[in-house]
């Protein structure tokens, strides 16, 4: 993932805990932003459940060490391109994390293990290539429901796909 070219003054938009591992509060000034740039916050490994839902975000620049994105964290935004391929510590895509967006292009990390219920529900994904996700074992119910998938590639070692 490339670095953001945008200057985002995070102290105007967020309150962090003392060691910068968690966003405590999103300030009202952030409401009109369409870019979330947390790339420089290497200590941030987790984003709380529902923390950025309904913000009309178009672009995400997350810290490379991100491990956990809580359920519904980016629900109902305007994300179109989503490249998570460099987030090697991200093992599970939780329920509803990217539901109700506009995602057309999606790249996941090679070591993703599970995609939970409705993780990418109601997007615009047409080509879904998960063949590089060699540790992917489970795709849960409705994970990609209401997309426009025309071409699908899965890894050979997948164990369970729920419809």
Predicted feature residues:
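Structural signature of tandem-repeat unit edges
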Residues: 1-24, 31-46, 55-68, 78-91, ...
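Small-residue-biased low-complexity repeat regions
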Residues: 116-118, 142, 162
